[in-house]
Amino acid sequence: MAITYLLPLFLSLIITSSVSANFQRDVEITWGDGRGQIKNNGELLTLSLDKSSGSGFQSKNEYLFGKVSMQMKLVPGNSAGTVTTLYLKSPGTTWDEIDFEFLGNSSGEPYTLHTNVYTQGKGDKEQQFKLWFDPTANFHTYTILWNPQRIIFTVDGTPIREFKNMESLGTLFPKNKPMRMYSSLWNADDWATRGGLVKTDWSKAPFTASYRGFQQEACVWSNGKSSCPNASKQGTTTGSWLSQELDSTAQQRMRWVQRNYMIYNYCTDAKRFPQGLPKECLAA
């Protein structure tokens, strides 16, 4: 089924503008001993994985709320055992984190897209999906929108998940710790594919994932201050991602994805929560 719906793009005057992406300016490769490379004058970045090591990079900026997008083309062919990630994370032992994780699979089998939200080091809010396209054939855009009211995960402009701020119910929500954007390609064949039953085929190495089109509309955190001083006050900025929510059309698209492509939802896993489902699940 063709996907024609795109979420509206909102601009704000008090955020960093989404100028043309340039990896040389916006990110730094943090590990991999040369396996991560910036190419084409900063327009393309590749990560590779072999038996010795994977690789990764991070944004130079920290954000306290933002809308971060990346075009990615995942490892083709037999990617079993590999994990490609795009996420926001704060440092420390009680960290906040918002995850996209792409779990590789055997040739011809679809990737699993794993999402999760951590607050103060506590996660357990997983939702997993199969994608409705081949994520290795072309670049596709993955976006995390994080504002004081909600977190929205989108794929090519189509929302797949919304995690609302339900602190009124006692549910933790990440809103106090600035986070960087991170991405990595690494070996996780002890769990990534069929619970670790399928191992990485190192004869296919090096495995490579490609990135372009990094966009950051965000409240940049620098020297203990935000570029959006009123961002934590809900509803103070209208007409931007800081107050963006899903309209009825977007909600319909999200329900279509969840109905047809969601393969795991912690909110329906009664065996995992014998004392009762999390409160935010009952309120949804």
UniProtKB/Swiss-Prot annotation:
Induction: In response to mechanical perturbations such as wind or touch. Induced by auxin and brassinolide. This is Xyloglucan endotransglucosylase/hydrolase protein 22. Glycans are attached at residues 105, 230. The active site is at residues 97, 101. It comes from the Eukaryota. Keywords: Apoplast, Cell wall, Cell wall biogenesis/degradation, Disulfide bond, Glycoprotein, Glycosidase, Hydrolase, Secreted, Signal, Transferase. Its EC number is 2.4.1.207. The gene is XTH22. Catalyzes xyloglucan endohydrolysis (XEH) and/or endotransglycosylation (XET). Cleaves and religates xyloglucan polymers, an essential constituent of the primary cell wall, and thereby participates in cell wall construction of growing tissues. Its induction in case of mechanical stress, suggests that it may contribute in the adaptive changes in morphogenesis by being recruited to alter tissues tensil strength, or flexibility, enabling adaptation to mechanically stressful environments. Contains at least one intrachain disulfide bond essential for its enzymatic activity. Highly expressed. Predominantly expressed in green siliques. Expressed in young expanding leaves, trichomes, lateral root primordia, vascular tissue, abscission zones and elongating hypocols. Following wind stimulation, it decreases in the leaves of wind-stimulated plants, while it strongly increases in sites around cells of the pith parenchyma, between the vascular elements, and within the epidermis. It comes from Arabidopsis thaliana (Mouse-ear cress). Disulfide bonds join 219-228, 267-281. It is found in: Secreted, Cell wall; Secreted, Extracellular space, Apoplast.
